[in-house]
Amino acid sequence: MTYLRTVFMFMITATSLTGWADDKVSHVVQTPYSEQKVVYDFYFDNPEKMASALFWIRSLMNPLMDDPYNMAPEFLDIVVVIHGTEIVTVARKNYERYKDAVERMRYYASLGVKFRVCGIAAHDYGYEPDAFYEFIEVAPSAITELAHWQLQGYALITPTVMEKRFSIDEIR
């Protein structure tokens, strides 16, 4: 009798676990996104973080430009405000050191992304407006610029760029 009870309990448990696993899985959603208005606040403690921060722009644009949304870039209104150490990445004299990031920014600018540098930060770093690339606009202040765009209904995104200490395979 004990043997039959054990087999019976095992079968019930196995059946219920199998059914539970089939019913409890994630699924893909298609959020009905509309045209985007976003202002990014770039303020980093290391200019090398600019390259990683640019992936935040890609992560907004690519899903919206791909299926099922197929939005044209002109329906994505994106402004990037630069006012930390990363300001050196958009100074023309530093092209060789930051050329990969510069070319990615130039590409995004060709899609309509606006890049604004804080005039106060530019002054603090000793840069005149002509020190920057043709796709850069110099605003009076990053803080007033961020407030302005938020008051116009833009969503504020402040990228957090961490140092990668583990590969995905190490922690998966």
Positions of PLM-derived features:
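Bacterial N-terminal signal peptides that target proteins for export
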Residues: M1-V7
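Hydrophobic h-region of N-terminal signal peptides that target proteins for export
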Residues: M11-G19
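Cleaved targeting-peptide boundary
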Residues: W20-H27
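Acidic/histidine-rich, surface-exposed loop or edge segments in extracytoplasmic proteins
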Residues: T31-D45, I82-I87
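Structural recognition of the beta-strand scaffold that forms the well-ordered cores
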Residues: V38-D41, V79-I82, K114-V117, I157-T158
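Histidine-anchored nucleotide/phosphate-binding helix
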Residues: S52-M71
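Acidic helix-start/capping segments at beta-turn-to-alpha-helix junctions
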Residues: M71-V90
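A cross-taxonomic marker for long C-terminal extensions/tails that follow the last structured domain
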Residues: A91-R172
